[in-house]
Amino acid sequence: MDQLVQFVEPARQFAKDSYRLVKRCTKPDRKEFQKIAMATAIGFAIMGFIGFFVKLIHIPINNIIVGS
């Protein structure tokens, strides 16, 4: 019986902590959501431009090396 309690107790504690965390969480309001969405969009745009410029630089270098 002691082994069963030892096996089940961590799962029970995890479920209790998870339930408490979910009860404390709140949804962001419209202003906070827009701020997060804007920051994410700017991040995607910056990463896209970096990838574009890296590819733009590597295409001529690759053509010079391969010599097509």
UniProtKB/Swiss-Prot annotation:
GO terms for biological process: intracellular protein transport; protein targeting to ER. Gene3D superfamilies: Preprotein translocase SecE subunit (1.20.5.820). InterPro entries: Prot_translocase_SecE_dom_sf, Translocase_Sec61-g, Translocase_SecE/Sec61-g. It is a single-pass membrane protein. The keyword Transport applies. One of its GO terms (cellular component) is endoplasmic reticulum membrane. Pfam families: SecE (PF00584). The keyword Transmembrane applies. Residues 1-32 are cytoplasmic. The chain crosses the membrane at residues 33-61. One of its GO terms (molecular function) is ribosome binding. It is found in: Endoplasmic reticulum membrane. PANTHER family: SEC61 GAMMA SUBUNIT. Belongs to the SecE/SEC61-gamma family. Heterotrimeric complex composed of SEC61-alpha, SEC61-beta and SEC61-gamma. Component of the ribosome-associated ER translocon complex. Necessary for protein translocation in the endoplasmic reticulum and multi-pass membrane protein biogenesis. This is Protein transport protein Sec61 subunit gamma. The lineage of its organism: Eukaryota, Metazoa, Chordata, Cephalochordata, Leptocardii. The gene is SEC61G.
